Each structure stands twice: as C-alpha cells, then as structure tokens.
C-alpha cells in the first residue's frame, strides 16, 4: 500500500530530508494555467479582491482593437494638418512591444534595461547598429529620470501609439518633400521637431480616447473587439464566497455598464444550469471615474452615480457601503474604509504597471497581481524554441572550454570570434521569434526595463487572472529563490577557502570563542571595566525569526488577538 505525500508530510520525520533518497520533482500546473510569483502570498489572508476593467476583466482583442485605435489616431492627425499619405499606414502588430522608451530629442524608439542601457534602437523602421547608436548615445545609455525627454510606453493602450511614432519618423525621414534633420525635419522654411511631433501624437491619442469615437465604435461591435470568457462569473462567485470583490475603473459608468453587461451576457450564471445574474451582483463595491493613479493618492470626491441616467448625483457620498450602488471618484483610502480592510488584506488585479500596480503597492501596501496578456506568446516561444536556448547554453560551454586551462600567466589568446558571431546570430533568431522588437522581458541574456518593473512591483503575475481559478483559496504562492551568479553557477560542494584562496579572500563570519584571552581588549590600550554591559555579545536566535518570504504573520496576529481580548 502506497502512502500519499500529503499523509507522509504530516509527520515531521518524513519531510523531504528523509524521503528514501528519491529525487523529488515539484508539481507544477500547466504553463498556460500558471500564476507566477515574485513575492510570497498566502491566499487565505486575502479578504478583498479588487479589479481594473480595461485589459483585465475586459480583454481587448489583438490586433483588432489596436488597429482601431491606430486608424482613429491617424485620422485625427490628418484632420489637424498632417499629410494625407499617413492614411495608407496599417497597424503592424509584429513591430511594437510594451515598455519601449521614445526619445523625443532624436525620435528614436529604445528598448532599455533597468539601468538605462540600450538594448535595441530603432529610428522609424530602421534598426540602428552599434556604431550608429554610439553617435547619439556615446555610452549606449540614457538617463531614464529625464522624463521631459524620455517617455516610457508601458501600457497596452500605448501599442498603437508606439507603432504610429515609428511610422511618422520613418515617413518624414525618407519622404522627398522633407529634409531630415538630427532632431526633426524641415518643410521649406518650416521646422518640426520630434518633440513637437510626439506631443501631437500624445494629444491625438488622448482626443481619440476621451472625445473621439473609440469607445463608441468599440461598443458598436463588442464581439469583434472584446474577449468574453464564460469562466469569469464562476471565478468571481467563488471569490464572493471567501471575501469581498470590488471594481475600480477609470472608465465612465455608461461605457463600463455596456462592457460589463456584454461580459456577463451568458445563458447561465456562475455554473451551467444556474440562473443568469446581473453583472453588478458579483461586486460588493463598484467605482467608476477613478482617475488612477491619482486614486491611490489624494483621490477625488466620492459621489454616487444615478444608474438610470449615468449622471452623478449632487453632493459627496458619506454613507456606509451599500450593495448595488455605483460610486464615482473616491480614493484607495475610502475603498479601504468602505470595505473595512487594510492594505495587505487586498489583492488588486490590473494590467497597468504604473497606474494599477506600482501606485497601489507603494502608497497603500496592497498586494498586487499584474495581468500580462503577452505572457501567453512569451511562454509559447520559450517552450517551442527551446532548441535555441539549448544552443546558447552549449555555446557558453564551448566558450568556457577554450579558457579552461588558462590563467594570468598564459600568453595564448583563444580565437572566440566564431563563437561570438554564433551567439549573436542565435540571440537575434531568438528575439525575432517574439517580434521585431524581441521579447517583452529580455534581449538575449539582459532583462528589460519592463521585466525589472514586473519583478519589483508585482507580487503575482499571469497571462490572465482567470488562472486563479486553478488554485485553492488556501494556496500559498511561494516565491522561488532568486539566485545571484555566484549561487546559480557554483555547485553545492564544500570548498575550504583557507586552503584554496589568497589571504585577501578569507573574510568569514564563523563563530569564534570570544572568551579566549586572545580576543580580549589589550590591557595597555584600555582597561576592562568591572561593570559589564547587560549583554556582552549577541545570541544566535533560538526561534524562527528569519521568515520574511512566507507571508506569515501568525505571531503578530496572535498578539493582536490577545490585545483585543485584554481590551474586552
């Protein structure tokens, strides 16, 4: 009779160290069902689940939605005086990726790492090589904090804008009617800087979103532009069983109502056979016109929406939370008060790394779940093109072999040029599998700015929040060890540093016998006082204190409960 792991693990003596010497393989869900972890999070501690709407609950179809936004923005630019030829451009989803930086001085799109080092540089449709890049960026580096010059195109809404900027720069650089300059272009005596062009594009994008017909055309053909997932009601109803669920969106009520009605327009309720429910019934709190990221700071006045007309009722709402009421404005502090929750009780789920994730974490301490729809393709390439990744590893091995028996006394210079060329070729082929700008998360071995932001601010991330459906609400999302190079490339074998290293590299932190006279202060320099400190040396912790990665505050909770009991 075999014993299940769950039964064996009930006994501390049967923990992995004593599991009959068999190698254990960690169980993992299918890649397309996975939720990935940057910081450990215990789901049973989450009391409230918060959602953004656009690109989170409502996922817009790609490239249909981006094409619509692109076309409308081009039409707006032409209407204010830009050349008619621009109407011939068609959105190409293989070119842009999120997280690119636009240099408004030189008109370049830059893919950079977390420190501002340039990984890819494109001027229009022309991908610049190393020498060209160094002419404008001598160290292949930018000052990211120069926000007046560099604009980060971080959101999914930025994708059409990213491609449009490339189209415009390429057009004005190569069209015979215009004279190309380093910082813009000339039409006779008229000069247009890339900075002015960029501002025109920004203004046109804002006009399309807030005054134009983007939302109108979207709701006219929702099946074409919005993904409907029949599992959505089931997940929200299960969340309702273990906590509160709320919606915070920047969209107005009329648009929100049409989108949400479509998402929940199913022949059944949470489960097949159950009766249909209105979308409002799945949420304890609904808040529109949030104006994130301002919402996570001082916020705006909280008002009540008249759901019959979509207009706001007069006055500030000061009452308690009421089920079925739709609110406008407000702030994250107000949400916490209405829900009776504090920062870490809340898991907020959104797609906007700045407006949703960074601000909710830094200002409120909310736990964060970042939705990254591109992750599905990233995982596909990662698994489908594994041969390219394996070849890169093999090339690293060949490179190491060439230097294997050489040290500082060697005059031999191995010819590594062919290996370097092959590494560049394989890295390029690998990048092109993702699109013209390469992976969202890396360029070769270098992680992108976007990847560093995901790791820094998102506790959890996945291609879709629907993946939470495949985990119990008691689940502990435990972060994997993030290894530094000296940890990931060194085997777990004992090395005696006293015998193998120079005296300059032997600093250690092992215990010493401080009672030995050799470690007492020298009597000639200072006499030892007869009055000794209460604790002469620190004591090694006898209880578990170094457990910051487990999202485990049991002792704090017990202390709080004891204090509450004493007060009663």
UniProtKB/Swiss-Prot annotation:
Region (Disordered): 528-568
Family that this chain belongs to: Belongs to the 5'(3')-deoxyribonucleotidase family.
Superkingdom of this protein's organism: Eukaryota
Source organism (scientific name): Xenopus tropicalis
Binding positions (Mg(2+)): 52, 54, 351
Active-site residues, as the UniProt record annotates them: 52, 54
Subunit text: Homotetramer.
GO terms assigned for molecular function: 5'-nucleotidase activity; ATP binding; GMP 5'-nucleotidase activity; identical protein binding; IMP 5'-nucleotidase activity; metal ion binding; nucleoside phosphotransferase activity; XMP 5'-nucleosidase activity
InterPro entries, alphabetized: HAD-like_sf, HAD-SF_hydro_IG_5-nucl, HAD_sf, Pur_nucleotidase
Biased composition, class Acidic residues, residue ranges: 550-568
The protein's name: Cytosolic purine 5'-nucleotidase
Keyword Iron: no
Gene Ontology annotations of biological process type: dGMP metabolic process; GMP metabolic process; IMP metabolic process
Regulation: Allosterically activated by various compounds including ATP, 2,3-BPG/2,3-Bisphosphoglyceric acid and Ap4A/P1,P4-bis(5'-adenosyl) tetraphosphate. Binding of an allosteric activator is a prerequisiste to magnesium and substrate binding. Inhibited by inorganic phosphate.
Residues spanning the signal sequence: none
General function of this protein: Broad specificity cytosolic 5'-nucleotidase that catalyzes the dephosphorylation of 6-hydroxypurine nucleoside 5'-monophosphates. In addition, possesses a phosphotransferase activity by which it can transfer a phosphate from a donor nucleoside monophosphate to an acceptor nucleoside, preferably inosine, deoxyinosine and guanosine. Has the highest activities for IMP and GMP followed by dIMP, dGMP and XMP. Could also catalyze the transfer of phosphates from pyrimidine monophosphates but with lower efficiency.
EC number: 3.1.3.5, 3.1.3.99, 2.7.1.77
GO cellular component terms, A-Z: cytosol
Record localization: Cytoplasm, Cytosol
Sequence positions that bind IMP: 52, 54, 202, 206, 215, 249-251, 292
Catalytic activity: a ribonucleoside 5'-phosphate + H2O = a ribonucleoside + phosphate; a 2'-deoxyribonucleoside + a ribonucleoside 5'-phosphate = a ribonucleoside + a 2'-deoxyribonucleoside 5'-phosphate; IMP + H2O = inosine + phosphate; GMP + H2O = guanosine + phosphate
Cofactor mode of binding and number, as noted: Binds 1 Mg(2+) ion per subunit.
Cofactor field: Mg(2+)
Region (Required for tetramer assembly) location: 548-568
Sequence positions that bind ATP: 144, 154, 453, 456
């Amino acid at each position: 009779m075999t014993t299940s792991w769950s039964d064996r693990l009930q006994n501390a003596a049967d923990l992995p160290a004593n599991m009959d010497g068999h190698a254990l393989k960690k169980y993992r869900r299918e890649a397309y069902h996975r939720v990935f972890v940057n910081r450990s999070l215990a789901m049973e501690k989450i009391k409230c689940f918060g959602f953004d709407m656009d690109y989170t609950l409502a996922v817009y179809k790609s490239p249909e939605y981006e094409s619509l936004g692109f076309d409308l923005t081009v039409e707006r630019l032409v209407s204010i005086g830009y050349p008619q030829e621009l109407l011939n451009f068609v959105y190409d989803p293989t070119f842009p990726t999120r997280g690119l930086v636009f240099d408004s001085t030189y008109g370049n799109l830059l893919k950079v790492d977390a420190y501002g080092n340039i990984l890819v540089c494109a001027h229009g449709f022309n991908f610049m090589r190393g020498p060209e890049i160094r002419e404008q960026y001598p160290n292949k580096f930018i000052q990211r904090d120069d926000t007046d010059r560099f604009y980060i195109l971080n959101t999914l809404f930025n994708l059409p804008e990213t491609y449009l900027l490339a189209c415009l720069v390429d057009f004005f650089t190569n069209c015979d009617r215009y004279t190309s300059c380093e910082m813009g272009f000339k039409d006779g005596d008229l000069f247009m800087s890339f900075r002015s062009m960029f501002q025109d594009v920004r203004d046109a994008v804002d006009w399309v979103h807030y005054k134009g017909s983007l939302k109108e055309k979207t709701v006219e053909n929702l099946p074409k532009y919005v993904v409907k997932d029949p599992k959505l009601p089931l997940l929200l109803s299960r969340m309702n069983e273990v906590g509160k669920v709320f919606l915070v969106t920047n969209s107005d009520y009329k648009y929100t109502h049409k989108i949400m009605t479509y998402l929940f327009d199913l022949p059944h309720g949470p489960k097949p056979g159950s009766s249909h429910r209105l979308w409002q019934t799945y949420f304890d709190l609904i808040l529109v016109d949030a104006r994130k990221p301002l919402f996570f700071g001082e916020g705006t006045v909280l008002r009540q929406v008249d759901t019959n007309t979509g207009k706001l009722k007069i006055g500030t709402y000061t009452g308690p939370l009421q089920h079925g009421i739709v609110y406008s404005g407000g702030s994250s502090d107000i949400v916490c008060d209405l829900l009776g929750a504090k920062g870490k009780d809340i898991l907020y789920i959104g797609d906007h790394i700045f407006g949703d994730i960074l601000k909710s974490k830094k200002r409120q301490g909310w736990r964060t779940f970042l939705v990254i729809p591109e992750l599905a393709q990233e995982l596909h390439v990662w698994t489908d093109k594994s041969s390219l990744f394996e070849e890169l590893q093999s090339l690293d091995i060949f490179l190491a072999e060439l230097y294997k028996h050489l040290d500082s006394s060697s005059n031999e210079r191995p010819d590594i040029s062919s290996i370097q060329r092959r590494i560049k070729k394989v890295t390029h082929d690998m990048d092109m599998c993702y699109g013209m700008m390469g992976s969202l998360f890396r360029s070769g071995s270098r992680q992108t700015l976007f990847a560093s932001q995901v790791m820094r601010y998102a506790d959890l991330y996945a291609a879709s929040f629907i993946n939470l459906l495949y985990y119990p609400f008691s689940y502990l999302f435990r972060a994997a060890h993030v290894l530094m190079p000296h940890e990931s490339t060194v085997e777990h074998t004992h090395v005696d540093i006293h015998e193998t290293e120079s005296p300059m590299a032997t600093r250690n932190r092992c215990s010493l016998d401080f009672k030995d006279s050799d470690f007492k202060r020298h009597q000639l320099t200072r006499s030892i006082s007869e009055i000794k400190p209460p604790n002469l040396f620190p004591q090694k912790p006898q209880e578990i204190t170094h457990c910051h990665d487990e999202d485990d505050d049991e002792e704090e909770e017990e202390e709080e409960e004891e204090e509450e009991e004493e007060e009663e």
